[in-house]
C-alpha cells in the first residue's frame, strides 16, 4: 500500500497548489482596466511667447470691485493673452491649440482655477510653490475662455476642453517655416461664498496640441 500512497500524495499536493493559486488570483483580481493610448508627433515648433526657459506668461487682470461679481457664475475683467509659436515646419496643418493641464490649482468641481490670496513675486517657481501653500481666496476663481467667451473647462481631457484651434501662417522672415498665434482669455469668476478683497494669483500649465 505504501508505494501507491506516493503518487496519491503528489496528486493531492498538486491539487492543493492549484487551488491556492486560484484563490490568490481571485483575491488580486481587478475591478476593471484602464487602457491609456496616445500619439507622439515629430512636429516641432518653438514657443516664442511666453519666452524664457520656463515659458511663463503673466496675465495681469484689471483691478475690479467686488460688486462686479455679485452672484455665482458672474465673470469680470476678461483679459486677452497670446501664445505664439515660431519655426514650425512648412508641412504643419491647420488646427493647433493649447491644452491647459490639470494640476494643484484645478478645481474639478467648477472646472475653473482656484485663486489664492497671494501676490505674484516675479519668480515663477517660487510663486508656484508659494501658491500651493497659500490660503485659497474666498468667493472667486480664475477662468480660462476661448475668444468668443466660451469657457475652457479645466481638469478634463483635450477633446472635452474644446479649446479654440488656430491655423499656422507662413513666417515672412523665413518662408520655409510657419508661425502660429493662439488667443485666449482669462477672467475672474464668482463662486459660492463671500469675496475677500485683496490680491489673487493662480497658475496653470499648458501643452501644445498639434493636428
Where are these regions (language model features)?
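Hydrophobic h-region of N-terminal signal peptides that target proteins for export
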Residues: 17-28
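Sec-dependent signal peptide recognition
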Residues: 7-17
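Mature extracellular/passenger domains of Gram-negative fimbrial/pilin and adhesin proteins
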Residues: 2-8, 26-211
Amino acid at each position: 500500500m505504501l508505494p501507491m500512497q506516493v503518487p496519491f500524495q503528489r496528486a493531492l499536493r498538486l491539487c492543493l497548489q492549484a487551488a491556492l493559486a486560484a484563490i490568490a488570483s481571485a483575491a488580486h483580481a481587478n475591478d476593471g482596466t484602464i487602457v491609456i493610448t496616445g500619439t507622439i508627433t515629430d512636429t516641432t515648433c518653438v514657443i516664442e511667447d511666453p519666452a524664457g526657459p520656463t515659458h511663463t506668461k503673466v496675465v495681469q487682470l484689471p483691478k475690479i470691485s467686488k460688486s462686479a461679481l455679485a452672484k455665482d457664475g458672474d465673470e469680470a475683467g476678461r483679459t486677452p493673452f497670446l501664445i505664439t509659436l515660431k519655426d514650425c515646419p512648412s508641412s504643419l496643418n491647420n488646427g493647433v491649440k493649447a491644452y491647459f493641464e490639470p494640476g494643484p490649482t484645478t478645481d474639478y468641481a467648477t472646472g475653473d482655477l482656484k485663486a489664492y490670496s497671494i501676490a505674484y513675486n516675479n519668480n515663477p517657481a517660487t510663486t508656484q510653490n508659494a501658491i500651493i501653500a497659500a490660503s485659497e481666496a474666498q468667493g472667486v476663481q480664475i477662468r480660462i475662455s476661448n475668444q468668443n467667451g466660451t469657457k475652457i473647462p479645466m481638469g478634463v481631457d483635450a477633446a472635452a476642453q474644446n479649446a479654440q484651434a488656430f491655423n499656422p501662417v507662413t513666417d515672412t522672415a523665413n518662408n520655409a517655416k510657419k508661425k502660429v498665434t493662439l488667443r485666449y482669455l482669462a477672467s475672474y469668476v464668482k463662486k459660492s461664498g463671500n469675496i475677500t478683497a485683496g490680491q489673487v494669483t493662480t497658475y496653470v500649465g499648458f501643452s501644445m496640441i498639434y493636428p
